[in-house]
Amino acid sequence: MAGARTAVALREEGWPGAVTLLGAEAHQPYDRPPLSKALLQAAPHGGNPGAAGAAGDGAAAAAGPAGATGLGIDFAALDVELLLGHSANALRAADRLVVAGDTALPYDHLVIATGADAVGLPGSETTPGVHVLRTLDDAERLRPVLAAGRPVVIVGAGWIGAELTTAAREAGCPVTVVEATARPLSGALPAEVTAPMAGWYEEAGARLLTGTRVAAVEPGGVLLGDGSRLRADAVVVGIGARPATGWLGGSGVELCADGSVRADERLRTSLPDVYAVGDCASFPSARYGERLLIHHWDNAFRGPATVAAHIARCAEETPVYDPVPYFWSEQFGRFLQYAGHHSGGERLVWRGDPAGVSWSVCWLRDGVLTALLAVGRPRDLAQGRRLIERAARLDPERAADPSVPLKSAAV
């Protein structure tokens, strides 16, 4: 996504030079959200409210006719060269070359958009019946497994684990979810917000084991830390992703401790004329006062415009990249949307009953809205996102009344 969007943005900026898009996958660029949000489900549904087209369009068109993709991009018309099925192995910055197998590609400007790789468990890559979900090929391997309706163990109760559980249960699979921490989404949201979410698994007919460690994956199941075993026809590991930046070792591109490319406020790296965008790059946020690494669709979609503007205009006055992070998730018959960054929030304000089907929660810092999670309340999200962008202060009492439009709580 990020690489394809950069190519489009360069042409939109009037960049006249050659543009080459190098990709490790053999498929044309496609949307990743449908892989977990719709592609695995028996009847793909839903859409991305932040993108054009239905959520299922990306994967379907990725295998479609040459020249058109699920992203709605005609690369031939844009005069963009696609080199698919070629992985970048090394960067020789002194020579301005990217090495991909036996090929060395020269560049004037380089945009690193290698995304992130799924985190696995020891032995998971070589154990039969163990899956991850990061690529279209991963999804195609997993689809018939779910269609068979056989028992599945899902490792991880984060965003991807919840969406996988939803898809597997809708396919009729008996599902056991193993989560090492005490609650779902423990690494993403505070305990008081995730408290009602454990019940969603039970409602869906899935068994959720929290505080449970997987000691090993085995053919036909997993070995747990207490020595017991869970039998399953398939094991799906959904415990996160890490930036795909290993190929940059020794290149001179500075990496952060988390493996992300250390980009600046215009997504420039430590090397001249080398940029980084999407899941592989972290950037400083003046809005939140910290460096952000965002593994979500909206970041991959929006960041390329900043990079393309700087390349095409070669000017410091190009806008800095400091977005309000946004993502969405469809799970257990609910539509969740999140905007902002809540780590600095000092006060939680609830809108509605979290035991109900629709509710929102706001994070405030010094009265300013910094983040919002909306469950089945898309209007709250749309209004809240705009309020966050302008650093609006809220009246907590009015904000807590779900019958009052959130924008009307601004003071």
Walk through the language-model features, giving the residues of each.
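Short loop/edge segments at beta-strand edges and connector loops
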Residues: 84-86, 92-93, 134, 179, ...
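C-terminal catalytic lobe of FAD-dependent flavoproteins
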Residues: 228-256, 333-411
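Glycine-rich Rossmann-fold phosphate-binding loop(s) that bind the pyrophosphate
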Residues: 1-2, 24, 134, 155-158
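FAD-binding core/adjacent interface of flavoenzyme oxidoreductases
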Residues: 51-59, 68-151, 223, 236-238, ...
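Beta1-alpha1 glycine-rich phosphate/pyrophosphate-binding loop at the start
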Residues: 1-81, 167-188
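Mid-to-C-terminal Rossmann-like scaffold of FAD/NAD(P)H-dependent oxidoreductases
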Residues: 280-378
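FAD-site-proximal beta/loop scaffold in flavoenzymes
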Residues: 126-149, 221-223, 229-301, 306
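Rossmann-like dinucleotide-binding cores of NAD(P)H-dependent redox enzymes
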Residues: 66-68, 151, 159-215, 323-327
